[in-house]
């Protein structure tokens, strides 16, 4: 729909491999593996995922996008990830479970998709990058979704308004419109540098839960949040050399 509305041209052949990485990493692999893992893991493990993902994104930014972060950047990224992981493990009692393997694989796939999409957005644009990746994944997802809807028809019929509202939000914003801004930011600021913003996400989620749901906001959460924000701010000042932008053909 968006591609037709904008009359976007077909992507060049050289864009197919990065688009496939986005499709496999961000559209199929990451949501599928995390949904499997979080069935048996406590919610705090989701913060572990977010804590590892920025560092993994920086690694793939170096591998796929040709970026060269300085030693200072790697130190700040590692410290930030360690803070978030330590906070999450402290909330969950410090235990790891077999389903954490799915979390680890999800992190690798998402980091690959972020880096490939961020690099591609420099020439294709953030909107076209996610739209073409969604279209590329459609032949795999449509039959699978149709089969799942047929299998779970009674559950779908019994789902309430809150469930459908959450599903619509994730579908429209998290998996579509959000990527417009995410890939645009990576195209402007670089994969490694912009990816570090994810470190603040767990604490913003806890703040939102406190404001919207009335959940208690403990003082260790505030301390960790301030420390992570300070690390992200310091990391933004560290040098990251970016590869020259080459047009796709």
Predicted features by range, described:
Residues 1-12, 32, 36, 79-96, ...:
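Membrane-interface helix-cap regions at the ends of transmembrane helices
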Residues 37, 63-65, 69, 120, ...:
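Hydrophobic/aromatic residues within transmembrane alpha-helices
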Residues 25-27, 31-68, 106, 191-210:
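Specific alpha-helical transmembrane segments that line the substrate/conduction pathway
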Residues 14-23, 69-81, 99-103, 124-134, ...:
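Cytoplasmic-side transmembrane-helix entry/capping segments in multi-pass membrane proteins
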Residues 3-4, 57-58, 77, 94-152, ...:
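Transmembrane alpha-helical segments that form core, pore/gating elements
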Residues 1-50, 86, 171-189:
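Specific transmembrane alpha-helical segments of multi-pass solute transporters/efflux pumps
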Residues 22, 60, 69-91, 108-110, ...:
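Hydrophobic transmembrane alpha-helices of multi-pass small-molecule transport proteins
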Residues 23-28, 32, 55-59, 85, ...:
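Hydrophobic/small/kink-forming positions within alpha-helical transmembrane segments
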């Amino acid at each position: 729909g968006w591609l037709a509305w904008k009359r976007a041209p077909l992507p060049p052949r050289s864009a197919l491999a990065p688009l496939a990485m986005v499709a496999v990493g961000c559209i199929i692999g990451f949501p599928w593996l995390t949904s499997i893992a979080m069935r048996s893991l406590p919610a705090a493990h989701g913060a572990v995922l977010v804590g590892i993902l920025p560092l993994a994104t920086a690694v793939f930014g170096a591998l796929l996008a040709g970026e060269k972060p300085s030693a200072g950047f790697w130190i700040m990224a590692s410290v930030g990830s360690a803070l978030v992981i330590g906070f999450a493990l402290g909330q969950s009692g410090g235990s790891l479970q077999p389903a954490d393997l799915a979390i680890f694989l999800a992190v690798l796939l998402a980091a690959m998709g972020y880096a490939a999409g961020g690099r591609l957005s420099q020439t294709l644009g953030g909107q076209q990058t996610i739209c073409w990746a969604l279209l590329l994944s459609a032949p795999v997802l449509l039959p699978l979704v149709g089969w799942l809807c047929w299998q779970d028809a009674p559950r779908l019929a019994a789902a309430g308004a809150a469930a459908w509202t959450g599903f619509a939000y994730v579908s429209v914003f998290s998996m579509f419109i959000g990527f417009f801004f995410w890939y645009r930011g990576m195209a402007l600021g670089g994969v490694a540098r912009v990816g570090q913003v994810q470190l603040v996400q767990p604490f913003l989620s806890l703040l939102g839960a406190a404001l919207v749901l009335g959940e208690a906001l403990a003082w260790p959460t505030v301390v960790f949040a301030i420390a992570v924000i300070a690390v992200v701010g310091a990391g933004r000042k560290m040098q990251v050399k970016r590869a020259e932008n080459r047009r796709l053909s």
